[in-house]
Amino acid sequence: MLQALNLPKKVYFKPGCMPVALRELGDIYRCQRALLVTDPELYRAGIAAPVADRLRKQEIRVAEFFTIGKRVSFGDLRSALPKLSEFQPDVIVGVGGNNAMSAAKALLALYGDPDLDLAAAAADPARIPACAKAKLVLIATNFSSGSQNSPFAILKGEEGQAIVLKSIHLLPEISVTDADFTAGLTAEQVRTCGLKSLSHAVRAYLDPDCTELTAGMLTEAIAAVLKYTERAMNGSPSAREKLHNAAALAGASYGNVVDAITPDLPYFPTGEEITVSDNDVRCAELAERLGFAGCRDFFSACQSV
């Protein structure tokens, strides 16, 4: 049974908070070299650019690593080892959804131990080292997995199968839940993220290891998704902030409730494809049975796109 809440060292969660959060890297941590981990689509769309610009304004050198495909593979991660060795970053910054943030977590682990067997580490989390060479910063650009606050990294194994790492050493020094990054999400993306976030929260809420502390966060997350998804789909910035915070709460909670996640469970963060499954819909129906208000309106909003 859980006896302590394991969370990022510092959690920023207001619109526009990214520059304030990153200021710490120069002012407090005296970082000089940052490895920016992101998805090519986000980079081309300019979504990651404000992060790189902010780092450079603090005279922090920036190198980039781009994830490939919908889930980062062992091979992709291994290909980054020469860059890690040559560039010697003192901070790794993951910007994106679950895929980019999982890649940043795995690279931190490999930076700490380049010989780490990722498949073996998935079976034995004690193998995952604490990395003394770099801090980890995670910046979420959607509200599906809440990975910026969770100890999970979801990777693609040698045979294409999903491999899940979990360790408190994969929690970031700083997590950033800045709703300004969600402004470009379409109504359909908002719907899909809302269903996925609700699925995570409901499954963790029903888990036998859910405690009073995690239940409080999950109750808030479930209620927010049900109440604000329709408004967020219609473009409301304040509603998108609510959903972004709800996903952050869900991620922080299921990371403290669930010992392991597998691809067949609905709270499994599926990466950038973020497809809606029947399990996600069933979890939304479970929320109604649990007595949460607003389920009918939520279903109607989801069916409208």
Question: Where are these predicted regions, by residue range?
Answer:
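ATP/NTP phosphate-donor binding region
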Residues: 1-91
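A glycine/threonine-rich phosphate-anchoring loop and its flanking beta-alpha core
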Residues: 9, 112-212
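Short glycine/serine/threonine-rich phosphate/pyrophosphate-binding segments
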Residues: 18-21, 44-47, 74, 99-104, ...
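Glycine-rich beta-strand-to-loop/alpha-helix junction loops that act as flexible
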Residues: 38-39, 95-97, 233
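Short Gly/Thr/Asp-enriched flexible loops that form oxyanion-binding sites at enzyme active sites
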Residues: 50-51, 80-81, 100-114, 149-152
